[in-house]
């Protein structure tokens, strides 16, 4: 998840953003767990767009979310605004890329990937690169101008490397 989304949610909307692992069911289950532990958590939404609301029993229901957006658009229009204006202050990174690094020539892609992640984190700490904590999946390296996240794919024998920068180039 981009730093810009976190800033928008926390600074503009005064919400709490939990950057959790990928996988819509993982996100929904964590949201349910948080609510059951007393942490108010009304929305679970995954990077892919899957989302669930507590008011709808945490069902992954795109039609329900679409109706909620239509209602928000109607309310915005009554106030002379557009639905797009609701996210006017949401900034985008200057650049964002993803590379999928294939894991080959091994019988256990997950074990190999975990060893790569362990080595990356160890080396990053040795050279004093900030490692995000907590990190629920992979290793997220933090830089003044952006971040990089290396993780295991949920479904394929590869390691996605996502990078975002606040500066072009």
Where are these regions (language model features)?
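Phosphate-binding and adjacent anionic-ligand microenvironments
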Residues: 1-169
């Amino acid at each position: 998840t981009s730093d810009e989304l976190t800033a928008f949610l926390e600074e503009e909307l005064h919400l709490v953003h939990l950057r959790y692992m990928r996988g819509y069911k993982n996100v929904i289950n964590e949201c349910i767990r948080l609510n059951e532990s007393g942490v108010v958590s009304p929305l679970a939404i995954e990077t892919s767009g899957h989302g669930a609301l507590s008011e709808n029993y945490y069902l992954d229901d795109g039609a329900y979310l679409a109706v909620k957006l239509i209602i928000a658009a109607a309310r915005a229009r009554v106030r002379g605004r557009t639905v797009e204006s609701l996210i006017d202050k949401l900034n985008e990174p200057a650049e964002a890329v993803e590379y999928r690094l294939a894991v080959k020539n091994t019988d256990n892609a997950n074990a190999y990937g975990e060893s790569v992640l362990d080595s990356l984190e160890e080396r990053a700490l040795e050279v004093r690169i900030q490692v995000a904590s907590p990190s629920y999946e992979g290793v997220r390296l933090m830089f003044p101008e952006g971040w990089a996240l290396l993780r295991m794919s949920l479904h394929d024998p590869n390691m996605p490397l996502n990078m975002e920068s606040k500066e072009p180039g």
